[in-house]
């Protein structure tokens, strides 16, 4: 009867109560049990109070209970029914590996996207640099070509200018070259001895025929006004050229340019005549006149200041783009591209 009563009493007690009673019978404290089982005191307390910690897996809890039972000399078979209720086996939740694979796939995709972005950026920078270099090279080649053309034209013009005086000097009559001293001597004689002017009609007419109009102009300009009275009544006065005496009138379409640095320039008027083509140095200036409109090509727009009809010409659009300036200056309107 006593054995059956003891068995029923053990079945009525929970696993934790049985372990606590056995510990107290052996005179052990919770601290001692915890040190022997290498557990926390709170874990031993939870086991005796039949509590299952939330952060502790059921497999570990069952192992701790078995170790506790062996320590207090309780057969494990007697605790198995209570273990099924207190710490039932639960399937462990295995974290899916999909998240890792997804993260790896996302990281790989982000890497490809970043690589593609950098590749596109490098391509854009390379194309921009190539375009700028080609444009700059084309401008330099154009300036060089225009400079070569202008130098060739200047050399051809200089050769033609040198050949003209040589031809005129060879075709000049020697008699005409010797005439000016004679006229000068005659003038000097007239100014020194007025009494000798009476025999002037006896001069050989061939000498008068040799004198050219230009030489006559020189003589009349050199002799004073009273010499006209000394000439004989029968001789007609020589014609004088009054065109050289008139003062030149300023052209309203004059083109004035001042240079602050070395600059290549070409100016053409409406007739196609090149008023200037070549290199201008720093601190130089040009004053050109011709038939409007003028066509200008300027290699360095920032190095020149232009005034047309008394007004400055705006070259800021060419200076900003750093390009060769091509513009037309009309007679009655503002400069046009």
Swiss-Prot record:
Principal subcellular localisation of the protein: membrane
Pfam families: HTH_25, RodZ_C
Skewed-composition ranges (Low complexity): 168-207, 219-236
DNA-binding region: 30-49
SUPFAM superfamilies named in the record: lambda repressor-like DNA-binding domains
Family to which this protein belongs: Belongs to the RodZ family.
Record protein name field: Cytoskeleton protein RodZ
Organism, as annotated: Shigella boydii serotype 18 (strain CDC 3083-94 / BS512)
Primary gene name: rodZ
